[in-house]
């Protein structure tokens, strides 16, 4: 097994006017461990994020593909410590909920690999308009979708996956499993000087078997 695992990250951030574009690519070298069945496939994450903002409106569109990017300081851990020893952080491209019911099933990035997308639009209707009313109205729409990546198994001559490159994966192709999907519409409306109304519609899909393994 490799004694050291080299990793690097490249990031480019462009900003012009009201636009901001962020592109990032990270890769780790061969890192066989118990979570990837001791395969020698390299891991990587490619991410693109675009945002636009002006007075009263903002927009965000993101896409990310990760592949075999679980990265820990230990190759094996006891069952009581399976969620420890992470070196890298893989943020989820999903909305961070604050209300208890909506936050009941938070999503965590699948280190084996995934395609993740997120889009968000926020708009403030001005005061003293038909939809803004006396105090204005804020509307936010968020949509996120996370899907597995295609994985075509590679094996050694003896049929074993361990010690091989693990699998092949075409960059743009999805796998068979949808991990998570979330649609949220939020309306924030101030009715009186000291009284505000918050309304939210949520449609959430959570694949517990794929995400939690049970």
Residue ranges and their predicted role:
Residues 2-214:
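Exposed, low-structure sequence patches enriched in small/polar residues
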